[in-house]
């Protein structure tokens, strides 16, 4: 799957961007933390669209400045409305609460548990520990780390292969671009690509360029 982030600040713009993005990608990621205001009704609308609902905490590199309680309630609302995926951080103390809630109401939502390091790619043993912890909590493990070298890129690709079909792994930055291009072949459930001029992370590839490259590889 190709996932395209939606990073608009206005709700109506976000919906329009999502519709346009789905002409090129398979799903979108709604970065709810970037919206000026968000309501439960907005989450209901987002949940109708094939998407990942992400409300990234400020302490994990996001823009959510309101209370964590509101954040968790909005994510629960997405789960209640059977959003395709919700993303919750490994460091979030209430991640298990979301999983329990999902199971109790028998929602079809898959829960992605994520970890980010915007400066480096940790050693492989540390990354394995992260992924194992994530898989004990949610359905899909995700990590996005900054790749500073080819060695970092190989490390990330190796882990994708180890956890084939259970992981989303990304190498941010120029050195990590190969992880975005080869990720699907190495076992990542999805790869992120952006609409022109709307990258949500360093090194994100334009979706049209990515599709051209993937067609050449095939």
Curated annotation (Swiss-Prot):
Positions annotated to bind 3-dehydroquinate: 29-31, 56, 180, 200, 204
Active site residues per record: 116, 142
Enzyme class, first EC level, given as a word: lyase
Covalent S-S links between cysteines: none
Pfam families assigned: DHquinase_I (PF01487)
EC number: 4.2.1.10
Catalytic function, reaction form: 3-dehydroquinate = 3-dehydroshikimate + H2O
Involved pathway(s): Metabolic intermediate biosynthesis; chorismate biosynthesis; chorismate from D-erythrose 4-phosphate and phosphoenolpyruvate: step 3/7
SUPFAM superfamilies in the record: Aldolase
UniProt xrefs under InterPro entries: 3-dehydroquinate_DH_AS, Aldolase_TIM, DHquinase_I, Type-I_3-dehydroquinase
Keywords, in A-Z order: Amino-acid biosynthesis, Aromatic amino acid biosynthesis, Lyase, Schiff base
UniProt-listed CDD domains: DHQase_I
UniProt-recorded Gene Ontology molecular function terms: 3-dehydroquinate dehydratase activity
GO BP, sorted A to Z: 3,4-dihydroxybenzoate biosynthetic process; amino acid biosynthetic process; aromatic amino acid family biosynthetic process; chorismate biosynthetic process
Protein's UniProt keywords contain Amino-acid biosynthesis: yes
Entry's family note: Belongs to the type-I 3-dehydroquinase family.
NCBIfam families in the cross-refs: aroD
Oligomeric form and interacting partners: Homodimer.
Function per UniProt: Involved in the third step of the chorismate pathway, which leads to the biosynthesis of aromatic amino acids. Catalyzes the cis-dehydration of 3-dehydroquinate (DHQ) and introduces the first double bond of the aromatic ring to yield 3-dehydroshikimate.
Protein name, per record: 3-dehydroquinate dehydratase
Organism: Methanococcus maripaludis (strain C5 / ATCC BAA-1333)
Organism classification: Archaea, Methanobacteriati, Methanobacteriota, Methanomada group, Methanococci
